[in-house]
Regions:
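Phosphate/Mg2+-binding loops and adjacent switch elements
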Residues: 86, 90-193
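Nucleotide-state-sensitive switch-loop elements of NTP-binding domains
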Residues: 2-8, 13, 17-135
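C-terminal accessory "lid"/substrate-recognition subdomains
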Residues: 151, 159-240
Length: 243
């Protein structure tokens, strides 16, 4: 069966930065990897950012936002069916920063995907400099995107003091409690380390961290009303002589 890993995290947490490092490691270990990028916006910017890791051992498929939940599930299911037929042995899914993780689990339980795929690891990316106050919708997403993680990896840990990393972990606990979840993280399940210093042993541990069965109380809201997608394109400066 094809092992599928899920990289979750809120908008801007650093999922794509980590994914590039993680996929590069998997390819070096001899895996044939396909990345499934799911962006909230109409333009799949994240797919552009992973181009550097593409090659004989890695490819990418994309799903862009702008559709209702049922349509989105059909598109993801279709992509996963097509990917299973291409001979990959590892699929790494980077969902949007406001993704409903339960939706992904439901898709994997469908026939024929339940015969082709097995869930490997769920790795949640959380900003070590997480703001103290978030909207109710963002607090819910923080909980729902980490609740099944085998490991939480703090981003920007090199910029944070130990007290700030501890505050981010405490914030995560509060979000889980507010979402009426019994899931709590043991100290070894939260990794605060400069990503430039991540070793192959660290990445191997993340690849094998697995996932946890847990649930929380659902918060239903209009994602497009609560969050806005923006796309910034690089514009080359025009010299004064050409104006």
């Amino acid at each position: 069966m094809v092992q599928v890993d899920l990289i979750t995290g809120f908008l801007g947490a650093g999922k794509t930065t980590f994914l590039r490092r993680y996929v590069r490691y998997l390819v070096q270990q001899g895996h044939k990897v396909c990345i499934l990028e799911n962006d909230f916006g109409a333009v799949n910017v994240d797919a552009m950012l992973v181009q550097e890791v593409l090659g004989p051992g890695c490819d990418v498929e994309t799903i862009s936002g702008g559709c209702d939940c049922d349509t989105h599930q059909r598109r993801m299911r279709t992509k996963l069916i097509a990917m299973a037929m291409r001979g990959f042995d590892r699929v790494v899914v980077e969902p949007s920063g406001i993704f409903d993780v339960d939706e992904f689990f439901d898709i994997l339980r469908d026939d024929p995907l339940d015969r082709w795929y097995q869930l490997g690891s769920v790795i949640a990316i959380v900003d070590a400099l997480l703001p103290e106050t978030l909207s109710p919708q963002a607090e819910y997403l923080l909980a729902s995107e980490t609740i099944n993680a085998g490991c939480v990896l703090l981003s920007r840990a090199q910029l944070a003091a130990p007290a700030q990393c501890a505050a981010a972990a405490a914030h995560l606990e509060r979000a889980l409690e507010a979402a009426k979840s019994s899931r709590r993280f043991a100290p070894g399940e939260i990794l605060a380390k400069d990503w430039d210093a991540l070793t192959d042993a660290d990445l191997a541990a993340l690849a094998a961290c697995g996932y946890r069965q847990a649930s929380c109380e659902k918060l239903h809201f209009d994602q497009h009303a609560a969050f806005t997608s923006l796309c910034f394109l690089e514009l080359h400066q025009i010299g004064r002589a050409h104006v």
